[in-house]
Amino acid sequence: MAKCGSCGPGYKSPLDAMKGPREEIVYLPCIYRSTGINKPDYLATVDVDPKSPTYSQVIHRLPMPNVNDELHHSGWNTCSSCYGDSSKVRNKLILPCLISSRVYVVDVGTDPRAPRLHKTVEPHEVYWKCGLANLHTSHCLGCGEIMISALGDPCGNGKGGFVLLDGETFEVKGNWEAEGETAQFGYDFWYQPRHNVMISTEWGAPKAFALGFKMEDVLAGQYGHSLNVWDWTEHRLVQTIDLGKDGLIPLEIRFLHNPDADQGLVGCALSSSIFRFYKEKDGKWAAEKVIQVPSKKVEGWALPEMPGLITDILISLDDRFLYFSNWLHGDIRQYDITNIRNPKLVGQIFLGGSIQKGGPVAVQEDKELECQPDPVTVKGKIIPGGPQMIQLSLDGKRIYVTSSIYSIWDKQFYPDMLKEGAVMLQIDVDTEKGGLKLNPNFLVDFGKEPDGPVLAHELRYPGGDCSSDIWI
């Protein structure tokens, strides 16, 4: 982490962050909900230092005090948005729960290699003070508060709102959005104060996705297809951009890291597309599709056509490359976005997925591949599931990937993963010409955990990363 006489947490700029130290440990949530194992979810600490004797191993586990929380994403008590405030210290990891609506605050400052629970925010505080539930993305704000997106109301209906936590006491302060302002659905968000804007995305109604994915729910309007544009200073919803059938279930959203940038990218899961969003001359915002992953005609699967299902995207800190995962097809892609309106595919790697050879699915028509990809084996283990959450090293030269998306959907689309556990892999990245290569020496097999196979999701470095930190 950057050090100076008067600076706060993180780094002065995205390019400064690229010069930060190499990651040595990562934190990631491990989930038992829906697996048949009645144990609490836990925060795992994994050693990713190649020089360490415990490299590629879980070195600590912090179980939560409750079961069936569905730990999912995480954020920080403070980050690079507070770089100018020397009183701020990045020492707490914020863990909102997707199903229970709890928020766990974890102390990672006292002993970074052995985190400890600092505080639990119970769901009734979120219900009563905010009228929200099903928590997802956590971002630290420049003012020192913590903002968490919500996907629904306490009854399971879709409702896109935001919970504010005090950055010191971690008490629920109330809603970020002004009274009466709400989006139809919620999921991820990213703010860009220099343009007085925040944009949020849409998954769907919790009562729909909590029971598994059904195409009927999409047709019934239970899933989102819009970007919601908020006035950052007035906390009002000022515009909704309907992405249409090419933008079904827009999930992860990333502005370019340059705080002056007035554009970014969003991944649309079901449509398997990437949209560029941008500010127009009149101050309104618009979106255009810049990448389309074609579906594959298949036999032996739930539907006659299989989408890629783009479930996570990242932009490198220098705004040169886009990375995303196709959870169903099984590949991670690298695009040169120097010309963001015309991304160029420069790297691709398959890591499992539903179309690999020897599986139940036969591909009948494929607009991209000549044959189905081979299964991937690392250290003797055939990789189950498909690549899902991805995290890029600060220097952009390594990607870490896990295979679980959400326990109910894991159970539905990759039932063997509940028996075998998720995996964590590492990919080497060519940042000159482009290219992705699997590191054969790195595997965390979550099928061998002490309490039985577990699902693993989003990754965080102690010093921040390209999806946790926002520069203002």
Swiss-Prot record:
The places in or outside the cell where this protein is found are: Nucleus; Cytoplasm, Cytosol; Membrane
Q: What class of enzyme is it?
A: oxidoreductase
GO cellular component terms attached to this protein's record:
cytosol; membrane; nucleus
GO molecular function annotations of the record: methanethiol oxidase activity; selenium binding
Q: Does the keyword Protein biosynthesis apply?
A: no
Does the keyword section mention Lipoprotein? no
The record's Pfam families line, in alphabetical order, gives: SBP56 (PF05694)
Q: Assign the protein's first listed, main location to one coarse class.
A: nucleus
Which Enzyme Commission number(s) are on file for it?
1.8.3.4
Give the pathway annotation: Organosulfur degradation
One biological-process term from Gene Ontology?
protein transport
Q: Which reaction does it catalyse?
A: methanethiol + O2 + H2O = hydrogen sulfide + formaldehyde + H2O2 + H(+)
Name the source's superkingdom.
Eukaryota
Q: Keyword annotations for this protein?
A: Cytoplasm, Membrane, Nucleus, Oxidoreductase, Protein transport, Selenium, Transport
Q: Which InterPro entries match?
A: Se-bd, WD40/YVTN_repeat-like_dom_sf
What is its membrane topology? Answer: Peripheral membrane protein
Q: What does this protein do?
A: Catalyzes the oxidation of methanethiol, an organosulfur compound known to be produced in substantial amounts by gut bacteria. Selenium-binding protein which may be involved in the sensing of reactive xenobiotics in the cytoplasm. May be involved in intra-Golgi protein transport.
Family membership, please give it: Belongs to the selenium-binding protein family.
**What protein name is recorded for this chain?**
Methanethiol oxidase
Q: Taxonomic classification, please? A: Eukaryota, Metazoa, Chordata, Craniata, Vertebrata
